[in-house]
Amino acid sequence: MDIQRIHELVRKVPVAEDVVRYAVRLAAASRPKQQGTPDFINEYVSWGAGLRAAQYLILGGKARALLSGRANVTWEDVRALAAPVLRHRILINYRAEAAGMTVETIIGRLLEAVKEG
């Protein structure tokens, strides 16, 4: 199977609306000073992920589902890709560094704060 065919196949994997909304909420919750943003984001993050992050959470979820032999994307696919997708899109501030926080710590807390469904 060639790369182009795999690419087309990945894009055809269906995603439930609630999983899409979860990916969007996860990316949006990483942005400080937005409605519904967790307090720790406002305290420790200077810059959060944009909407493109949600798109890549879903696209990566499609590839992960296909590689796992599943025909649809799950919340766990999105959660598993949160760190690789969000890591370079979240900029922590000096307060976070002083508190010993890392981007990975922030993403872990974000996954706890943003509920599935």
Annotate each language-model stretch with its function.
Residues M1-Q35:
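Phosphate-sensing "switch" segment of ASCE/P-loop ATPases
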Residues P32-G117:
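C-terminal engagement/docking regions of AAA+ P-loop ATPases
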